[in-house]
């Protein structure tokens, strides 16, 4: 495999719920079922999935019919740049993950190992955030 493409489903905080690593020449629509269906089968509380224009078509219809979840494809009008709603959350997650050296280079032979590295990087990031947000108690000086 010459290159890899990561497809991920994140929550509103930008935390990775499910990740799939496939060939770089694989279209987004082909990789999305690995991610979307796996999460929707295990998470009954999810009511809405936001996606960009690369996920239009049969996937949208299948998700809404089978799982009764709103699958909203965010589109932009015109040729000018415009900020897409909630798109920055996913891009921010990719930026967080790109800070990990193990993910910037392709060290693994198997895509499954790369997925594991994505999850490990996300766990490390979440633990670091929990540690930085803990309350520190000041000791009183005698």
Predicted regions, residues:
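Short, acidic/turn-prone active-site loops that include or flank metal/cofactor-
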Residues: 23, 75-80
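Basic, amphipathic alpha-helical segments enriched in Lys/Arg and hydrophobic/aromatic residues
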Residues: 57-61, 66, 80-142
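Polybasic low-complexity intrinsically disordered regions
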Residues: 1-70, 122, 136-142
């Amino acid at each position: 495999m010459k290159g890899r493409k990561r497809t991920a489903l994140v929550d509103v905080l930008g935390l990775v719920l499910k990740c799939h690593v496939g060939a770089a020449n694989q279209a987004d629509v082909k990789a999305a079922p690995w991610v979307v269906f796996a999460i929707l089968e295990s998470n009954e509380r999810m009511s809405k999935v936001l996606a960009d224009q690369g996920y239009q078509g049969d996937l949208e219809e299948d998700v809404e019919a089978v799982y009764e979840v709103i699958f909203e494809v965010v589109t932009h009008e015109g040729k000018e740049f415009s900020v897409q709603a909630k798109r920055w959350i996913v891009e921010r997650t990719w930026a967080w993950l790109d800070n990990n050296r193990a993910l910037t280079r392709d060290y693994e032979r198997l895509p499954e190992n790369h997925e594991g590295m994505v999850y490990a990087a996300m766990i490390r990031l979440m633990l670091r955030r929990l540690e930085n947000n803990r309350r520190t108690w000041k000791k009183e000086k005698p």
